[in-house]
C-alpha cells in the first residue's frame, strides 16, 4: 500500500453557523448528502455538524487532487459512522470515478472539533 492522496481542512464553526443563519437549510443541502441531511435535521448543534462535514469533504477533495471543482461536488462524498463512532467516507459520482483511476483501495478519515474549529484529514491509499 502507498499513500496516493492526503488532504486536511479546517472550518470555523461560527462562520458556518452564520452561513446557516443567512441561507437556512439551502447551505446544508448544498454540502450534505441525503442521508447526512436527514441526520442534520434532527440535531441541535447543526452548525457544528455541518462544519465537521464541510471540513471532511474539503479534505477529501484535496486528497483526491481536485478540490471541489472539475466535476467533483460536495455530494460526491458521504460521511457516516460505524458502530463505534469511527467516521467512514464513501465516494460517489466523479470522485468515485477519479478514485478508481488512481487505484484507491483504502480511505482513512479523522474528524475533530473544539470550541471554535472543526478539522479533518483524509488519506487515500492504493
UniProtKB/Swiss-Prot annotation:
GO terms for biological process: fatty acid biosynthetic process. It catalyses: apo-[ACP] + CoA = holo-[ACP] + adenosine 3',5'-bisphosphate + H(+). InterPro entries: 4-PPantetheinyl_Trfase_dom, 4-PPantetheinyl_Trfase_dom_sf, ACPS, Ppantetheine-prot_Trfase_dom. Its EC number is 2.7.8.7. Its cofactor is Mg(2+). This is Holo-[acyl-carrier-protein] synthase. Transfers the 4'-phosphopantetheine moiety from coenzyme A to a Ser of acyl-carrier-protein. Mg(2+) binds at residues 9, 58. It is found in: Cytoplasm. NCBIfam families: acpS (TIGR00516), pantethn_trn (TIGR00556). GO terms for molecular function: holo-[acyl-carrier-protein] synthase activity; magnesium ion binding. Belongs to the P-Pant transferase superfamily. AcpS family. Keywords: Cytoplasm, Fatty acid biosynthesis, Fatty acid metabolism, Lipid biosynthesis, Lipid metabolism, Magnesium, Metal-binding, Transferase.
Amino acid at each position: 500500500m502507498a499513500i496516493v492522496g492526503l488532504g486536511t481542512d479546517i472550518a470555523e464553526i461560527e462562520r458556518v453557523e452564520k452561513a446557516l443563519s443567512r441561507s437556512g437549510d439551502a447551505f446544508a443541502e448544498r454540502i450534505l448528502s441525503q442521508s447526512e441531511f436527514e441526520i442534520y435535521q434532527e440535531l441541535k448543534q447543526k452548525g457544528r455538524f455541518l462544519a465537521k462535514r464541510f471540513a471532511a469533504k474539503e479534505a477529501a477533495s484535496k486528497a483526491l487532487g481536485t478540490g471541489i471543482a472539475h466535476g467533483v461536488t460536495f455530494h460526491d462524498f458521504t460521511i457516516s459512522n460505524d458502530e463505534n463512532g469511527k467516521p467512514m467516507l464513501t465516494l460517489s459520482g466523479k470522485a468515485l470515478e477519479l478514485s478508481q483511476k488512481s487505484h484507491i483501495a483504502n480511505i482513512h478519515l479523522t474528524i475533530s472539533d473544539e470550541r471554535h474549529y472543526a478539522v479533518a484529514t483524509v488519506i487515500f491509499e492504493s
